[in-house]
């Protein structure tokens, strides 16, 4: 039992460190779309306890005079960021323009907490035609912007048809 207690304590501390405030990838996303320093002006946190039934949930509130966005997963959190930018800050980020200078934008601080729950487990994106008429011509930078756009819109199931031909060959008669 004496050997078991330190092991348990180490596991508890390891698990506590797995719920980061301002996750690095979310901070990087904010700085990519809004310019350097945007991540310091919006507080974010992944909080799995927000979801009671496994659905993606985000909440928008305020903390220390800043917007505070929490999500039950990284996908929910980035969706919440997209919702906040669109519906609170009135910033429209589109496919063709996913970056803007937000240094001069004063982010509104919500007075009440807004909670949104996604009704769909899977948010599908793309179609088979996209592989031929647009994806083939994208650069690495354009791919990164597309992934950021998907994150801001809650996409968690982009079409990945690469290798599908092998599955069809092995499964279909």
Question: How would you describe each model-predicted region?
Answer:
Residues 10-11, 173:
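Short, linear, compositionally biased motifs with a strong N-terminal bias
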Residues 31-53:
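Auxiliary, metal-adjacent structural segments of Zn-dependent hydrolase domains
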